[in-house]
From Swiss-Prot:
The gene is deoD. This is Purine nucleoside phosphorylase DeoD-type. One of its GO terms (cellular component) is cytosol. It catalyses: a purine D-ribonucleoside + phosphate = a purine nucleobase + alpha-D-ribose 1-phosphate; a purine 2'-deoxy-D-ribonucleoside + phosphate = a purine nucleobase + 2-deoxy-alpha-D-ribose 1-phosphate. GO terms for biological process: purine nucleoside catabolic process. Phosphate binds at G20, R24, R43, R87, V88, G89, S90. A purine D-ribonucleoside binds at H4, E179, M180, E181, S203, D204. The keyword Nucleus does not apply. The keyword Transferase applies. The active site is at D204. Its EC number is 2.4.2.1. Keywords: Glycosyltransferase, Transferase. GO terms for molecular function: purine-nucleoside phosphorylase activity. InterPro entries: DeoD-type, Nucleoside_phosphorylase_CS, Nucleoside_phosphorylase_d, Nucleoside_phosphorylase_sf.
Length: 238
């Protein structure tokens, strides 16, 4: 047990899928896993363990923002022996060639947060995904006939940012999606010797203002979830 996770030792699989919303974690577990058991519920940050096509996998929410997700990722790795974390979440986009409901595999994550500079002695840390996990996700998408975008994310500290000019900079540098956690999770994984990947579904277009509802974000991002789950099986074979 930790101050934030009340699961017993051995309750989590070595691979954990982490959406931000704990209700989305519940939906994923109940929809895609078999033999599901709720293993933690502190602060209503729900976590579940079950099997997917016979493979033990856990699902747990991580909340919003780098501080929240970093706490859960660190404790899962150091206290429960988790080896791989796949963040499955929503993101916005500023690019006109990226559409709402597109799936993005985050090879790297830029950020305006200082957390990785703090852990990396005030130097820039390249927050990147594990290559094998990213490759497995691309293979899983291709096997399902799904088109995915692969590239950089931007993990923002402010959801309601006053710096709208930064969106132009993001677009210039080819940022595919804007979210709030990937850079933190990649930093935690690097610090504690684990592996991580972020897969996002575009829920909002910052330029056109097209967006999905909260219910759609919870229930209809199934392509992303299936890609993540199948990537675990592919990764086991690599």
């Amino acid at each position: 047990m930790t101050p934030h996770i009340n699961a017993p030792e051995g309750a989590f699989a070595d691979v954990v899928l982490m959406p931000g919303d704990p209700l989305r974690a519940k939906y994923i577990a109940e929809t895609f896993l078999q033999d599901v058991v709720e293993v933690t519920n502190v602060r209503n940050m729900l976590g579940f363990t079950g099997t997917y096509k016979g493979r033990k996998i856990s699902i747990m929410g991580h909340g919003m923002g780098i501080p929240s997700c970093s706490i859960y990722a660190k404790e899962l790795i150091t206290e429960y022996g988790v080896k791989k974390i796949i963040r499955v979440g929503s993101c916005g986009t500023v690019r006109m060639d990226v559409k709402v409901r597109d799936v993005i595999i985050g090879l790297g994550a830029c950020t305006d947060s200082k957390v990785n500079r703090i852990r990396f002695k005030d130097n820039d840390f390249a927050a990147i995904a594990d290559f094998d996990m990213a490759q497995a996700a691309v293979q899983a998408a291709k096997a399902k006939g799904k088109v995915v975008r692969v590239g950089n994310l931007f993990s923002a500290d402010l959801f309601y940012t006053p710096d709208v000019e930064m969106f132009d900079v993001m677009e210039k540098y080819g940022i595919l999606g804007v979210e709030m956690e990937a850079a933190g999770i990649y930093g935690v994984a690097a610090e504690y010797g684990a592996k991580a990947l972020t897969i996002c579904t575009v829920s909002d277009h910052i330029r056109t203002h097209e967006q999905t509802t909260a219910e759609e974000r919870q229930l209809t991002f199934n392509d992303m979830i299936e890609i993540a789950l199948d990537s675990v099986l592919i990764g086991d074979a690599l």
